[in-house]
C-alpha cells in the first residue's frame, strides 16, 4: 500500500482527498498536517473527516509527518506548496500538486527541485477536464484563424487566484493549436473604449460568485456560427479522485515533473 500524507487535511479539499484516498485500493491514509495555529493540530483527523477515529493525528507542518508517508497530496496555497516541495525534495518524497496560482518563478523552481523527487503538477486533475484540454488544442488546430477564441470561467467567491489555472491551461492548449504564444495574445480584461478585437487574441474572462464549484467554457466563434465546449463540476470529488489516482501512479517513478496527461495516458492524443 502507498502511504499518503495530506496537506491542509482539515480543509475542504483535504477532506475530499481523504475520502478518495480511503476508497482507493492501493492507498493508505497515513499522515495529515496543518499550518501552525490551526485548531485541528493534535486531533484525530478521522473524527474530523469521517466521524470516527482512524489513528491519524494532525501534525504541525510537513516536517512533523514526512517520515510517515510515501507521497504528499497538496491543494493548499502557492507559497505553502513551494515550502512543501522543498521539503519533499530534501527527503526524496513524491508529491502531487493540485494547487493553482503558482508564479512563473515558482514553476521554474519546482522544475529544478524535481531533480530530487517525482512530482505530478497539474492545474486540474479531473479526467474530463484533461480531455477538454486536448479537445481545445485539436479544435483550435482544425478551425484555425477564422474563429475567435474566448474562454469564460466561473468559481466560488472564496477562490483566491484569477483566472483559474484550468482557464490558463485551456488558453495555452488552444494557443498551441493555432501556433500562438499565449504571453503575447492573452487578454484578461476589457474595459472602456478598447477598439476592435485583434483576431489573434485569446480572451480569458472570470466570474466569482457564491458556491460555484467550477465551470469552464471555451468558445470558437466564426462568421454565423460558434462552437462551445464546456465542463461543469458538481462537486470537488473529481479533483480529489484524480489526485488519488495520481498518487497511486506516481510512487516509484523517476524524479521529474509529470502532469495528468502522463497519469491518464493522454500524452499522445
UniProtKB/Swiss-Prot annotation:
The active site is at 155 (proton donor/acceptor), 159 (proton donor). PROSITE patterns: DAPB. It comes from the Bacteria. It is found in: Cytoplasm. Transmembrane segments: none annotated. The keyword Acetylation does not apply. GO terms for molecular function: 4-hydroxy-tetrahydrodipicolinate reductase; NAD binding; NADP binding; oxidoreductase activity, acting on CH or CH2 groups, NAD or NADP as acceptor. Pathway: Amino-acid biosynthesis; L-lysine biosynthesis via DAP pathway; (S)-tetrahydrodipicolinate from L-aspartate: step 4/4. InterPro entries: DapB_C (IPR022663), DapB_N (IPR000846), DapB_N_CS (IPR022664), DHDPR_bac (IPR023940), NAD(P)-bd_dom_sf (IPR036291). This is 4-hydroxy-tetrahydrodipicolinate reductase. The gene is dapB.
Amino acid at each position: 500500500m502507498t502511504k499518503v500524507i495530506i496537506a491542509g487535511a482539515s480543509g475542504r479539499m483535504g477532506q475530499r482527498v481523504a475520502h478518495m484516498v480511503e476508497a482507493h485500493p492501493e492507498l493508505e491514509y497515513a499522515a495529515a498536517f496543518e499550518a501552525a495555529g490551526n485548531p485541528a493540530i493534535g486531533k484525530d483527523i478521522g473524527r474530523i473527516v469521517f466521524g470516527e477515529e482512524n489513528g491519524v493525528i494532525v501534525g504541525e507542518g510537513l516536517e512533523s509527518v514526512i517520515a510517515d508517508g510515501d507521497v504528499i497530496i497538496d491543494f493548499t496555497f502557492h507559497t505553502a506548496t513551494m515550502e512543501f516541495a522543498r521539503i519533499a525534495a530534501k527527503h526524496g518524497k513524491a508529491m502531487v500538486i493540485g494547487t493553482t496560482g503558482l508564479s512563473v518563478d515558482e514553476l521554474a523552481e519546482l522544475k529544478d527541485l524535481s531533480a530530487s523527487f517525482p512530482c505530478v503538477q497539474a492545474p486540474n486533475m479531473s479526467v474530463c477536464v484533461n480531455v477538454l484540454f486536448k479537445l481545445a488544442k485539436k479544435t483550435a488546430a482544425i478551425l484555425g484563424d477564422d474563429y475567435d477564441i474566448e474562454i469564460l470561467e466561473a468559481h466560488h467567491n472564496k477562490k483566491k487566484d484569477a483566472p483559474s489555472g484550468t482557464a490558463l491551461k485551456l488558453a495555452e492548449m488552444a494557443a498551441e493549436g493555432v501556433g500562438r504564444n499565449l504571453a503575447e495574445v492573452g487578454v484578461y480584461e476589457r474595459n472602456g473604449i478598447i477598439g476592435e478585437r485583434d483576431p489573434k487574441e485569446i480572451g480569458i474572462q472570470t466570474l466569482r460568485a457564491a458556491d460555484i464549484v467550477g465551470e469552464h467554457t471555451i468558445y470558437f466563434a466564426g462568421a454565423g456560427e460558434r462552437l462551445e465546449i464546456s465542463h461543469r463540476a458538481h462537486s470537488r470529488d473529481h479533483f480529489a479522485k484524480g489526485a488519488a489516482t495520481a498518487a497511486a501512479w506516481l510512487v516509484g517513478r523517476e524524479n521529474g515533473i509529470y502532469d495528468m496527461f502522463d497519469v491518464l495516458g493522454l500524452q499522445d492524443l
